[in-house]
Structures are given as structure tokens and as C-alpha cells.
Amino acid sequence: MDINQIMTSLEAKHPGESEYLQAVKEVLLSIEDIYNQHPEFEKASLIERLVEPDRIFTFKVPWVDDKGKVQVNLGYRVQFNNAIGPYKGGIRFHASVNLSILKFLGFEQTFKNALTTLPMGGGKGGSDFSPRGKSDAEIMRFCQAFMLELWRHVGPDMDVPAGDIGVGGREVGYMFGMYKKLTREFTGTFTGKGLEFGGSLIRPEATGFGGLYFVNQMLKAKGIDIKGKTVAVSGFGNVAWGAVTKATELGAKVVTISGPDGYIYDPDGVSGDKIDYMLELRALSLIHISEPTRHAQIS
């Protein structure tokens, strides 16, 4: 494998897509030794076929805000690879979303899904729409407008989206509701749905729990016990909540969590009722951390 040659070719085809190019290079460097032991891979141009997405959909999403003004965002779906199953990957709503980021995420999702040994391909989608500061009605209207285009390209045997940053059970519910209306079908087209219409009970905490199980096994492999360790968690959503909860159960002490507005530090530990209370405030859009807080006082 000639990594420099591959990257030169990709840079010419995808100029300016730094996130995607960096992700590809990191993967190539990590598999180079093993790949070079299999000349049949080179003969089949396996890498060249893996690094390019199967197809990309880009579309405009016009929607009406609470003031009656029409807003227009961009929507994307990158169907990266379905060699072993339907495309599978989340939908992200965040102002930073662009095609390079989604290609990078879809590329890595292909490998993550393959490692589960389940028949799932890789994909990713989203929009530069940010739910932050938007009303429930605005978020609903945007999700419905987004699905007016995306519904043609997803389905239980084609492409199965899920949530990601900015997309939780509420947003998935809005999108799935519009999908059902357009297709007149109730199928397994989305994961991350609410319990009331076929979702999984452990979905909210699954990612955070899984991350801590992985960390715990890595520490054990090094002969280190997680009990008594001090932990800092970057994030303030479902993944962070699951990670904090499981870290505490395993005997570690989480002293800080962070969000887009700042962070909370509590040397006595952030867990249990404290984090549940903060997540409740966040869900109600009442919490705003404007300055770093050294000792959080939560009663």
C-alpha cells in the first residue's frame, strides 16, 4: 500500500475536506502492516473502494420559524458502504455539520459497525441546523421538513438512521412520524426511538455504559483497578450521563462534566441525584453556565 499516493489522489478529489482526509490517513496508517501481508487486497483495489462513499445526498431544508420567517438549512446523508448490510449511522444536527465531517464519520462508522459482527454497513447524515435555542415547535417543523427529502433514501433494508449530537428521542420521533406518514409503513427504519413506539429501554445510557466497560477492560489489561480513580467527563448529554453513572457504579469518582457553556467541578463527586438534577435543568433549558464554577453547590 502506497499511503502517500492514495492520499494525494484523495486530496485531489476531495479538496479542503480536512476531517475526512485525516480520518482516512489515520486508518490507513493503522492497517498498513496487515494490509501489506495480503497482496490479494491490493489486486482488488480494496482500499480505493473503501475510502470512497457509495453515494451522497445533499439537499436544502426550508422550514418556518416561530416568527413566520422561512429558514433554509442544508441536509446530508452519506451512504458510505453496505458490503455487509444496510447503511447504519446517526443523524447529527449541529451548526458545525458539513460534508467533510459526515464523510469522516461515515467512513469510521463502517468499521465500527463491522466490529459488532452484525450485518450493518456504515453511513452518516445530518444538517447544519442547531436545535439549541429553538422551540419544540421549531424543532418539530425542521425534523419534518428534513424527512420530506430523506425518506426516499432510507428504509429497514436500505439505510437505518439513528440519533447523534443534537438528535435524541424527541427528534427521532418527529422524523419517524413523518416517515410513517409518507410511506404508510411502520418499519424498523430508525433506531433511537422512544419506548412508546418501539424503542429500546436501555438506549439512552447504552453508549455511556459501553464506553466505561471498554475503559474498565483496558485498565484491567494494564493491571489497573478503576476503583478510586478520579474521572473527568467531557459532555453533558445522554452519553455523559451514562458514563458518569457507570463510572460511579464501578467505584470511580467523577469530579467534572462539561457542556457548550462551560463546566461544573465538584471535588466531592458529580453523580446520582446531582447529575439527574442538572440533566433535568438542561432538558428544561433553565441551566446556563456562563463562568467556570470551581465548587458546584447542588442541594
Where are these regions (language model features)?
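N-terminal Rossmann-fold NAD(P) dinucleotide-binding loop
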Residues: 240-241
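NAD(P)-binding Rossmann-fold cofactor-contacting core
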Residues: 252-286
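Structured beta-strand/loop patches that form or line metal/cofactor-binding pockets in enzymes
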Residues: 40-69
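Hydrophobic Val/Ile/Leu positions in short beta-strands of Rossmann-like dinucleotide-binding domains
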Residues: 231-233
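Glycine/serine-rich phosphate-binding loop and adjoining beta1-alpha1 elements at the start
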Residues: 94, 113-227
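Single conserved hydrophobic/aromatic residue that forms the stacking wall/gate
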Residues: 287-299
